[in-house]
């Protein structure tokens, strides 16, 4: 079974993917893992590769292609990434969401930054990603039609979120 888990920064995609992976004993990869692997392959630090990727659409395309290839060569895998659902032939596509203020609080705590700074960064990052995904892939990240399940992670804690996903997977047609 191939499962994708996507969501904007601070919605809990990494935590959910890791926890689900442990509970159902299916490995997971994240877009971040693949990005770090690509940095190593290009003999760059993560920062150098990030800066290189900013001006090079081919990096985004290669990252998406790599995730799809890994998933296509796997029988069971959880793929975590903002737009992985659009590139991976998944059995189940999940989108996690949370209000902007909740996302900002989570990131502020995780990264030990001021809430105001994080709110500004989230606004800029979301606008940048929205524009980039549309320009590079013709993907509107606000259109959630591709997803089988959408969960508000402000409403449910991690345990409940994972339980909802497990129940839905068990009952999928």
Swiss-Prot record:
It comes from the Archaea. It is an enzyme of class 2 (transferase). ATP binds at residues 7-15. The gene is cmk. InterPro entries: Cyt_kin_arch, Cytidylate_kinase_dom, P-loop_NTPase. Belongs to the cytidylate kinase family. Type 2 subfamily. The keyword Cytoplasm applies. GO terms for biological process: pyrimidine nucleotide metabolic process. It comes from Methanosphaera stadtmanae (strain ATCC 43021 / DSM 3091 / JCM 11832 / MCB-3). It is found in: Cytoplasm. Its EC number is 2.7.4.25. SUPFAM superfamilies: P-loop containing nucleoside triphosphate hydrolases. This is Cytidylate kinase. One of its GO terms (molecular function) is CMP kinase activity. It catalyses: CMP + ATP = CDP + ADP; dCMP + ATP = dCDP + ADP. NCBIfam families: cyt_kin_arch (TIGR02173). One of its GO terms (cellular component) is cytoplasm. Keywords: ATP-binding, Cytoplasm, Kinase, Nucleotide-binding, Transferase. The keyword Metal-binding does not apply. Disulfide bonds: none annotated. CDD domains: CMPK.
